[in-house]
Amino acid sequence: MKHKYNTLSWYKKERSTQLRRFIVHQPEVGLFFFLRDVVYNYITEKTTCRCPLTQERPCDTGGKFGRIWICQPEELGKMQIWICQPEELGKMQIDKNRTMVQQMWYIWYGGLDTSTNSLLPILVRGMA
């Protein structure tokens, strides 16, 4: 089932109006993650469902710095970004209710590790 978010015109409008100034700062590792780049994702029912056993969602591990969780269709606009400091692995810090949409990812994340699964085809650009 297609959503209105699949249209190119909506994508262009969303890119120009949302999250251009959103910054996540991790002082412990001295990195700024500018959520600038937009990636148009193909998130399917399979990738957005919860695990029936653990109720966990599929996620990108984000390397050692954290996890980026896929939001459910009914939770558009409530994308959750979990940020974990290297020395606090297992103690996740949550940054809730960012104005995200299911099929758009704004991220500037140096060294993002997406090799663990193919759920998130994320475009990564390093800082000059």
From Swiss-Prot:
User: Could you tell me what this protein is called?
Assistant: Putative uncharacterized protein encoded by LINC01553
Q: What is the lineage of its organism?
A: Eukaryota, Metazoa, Chordata, Craniata, Vertebrata
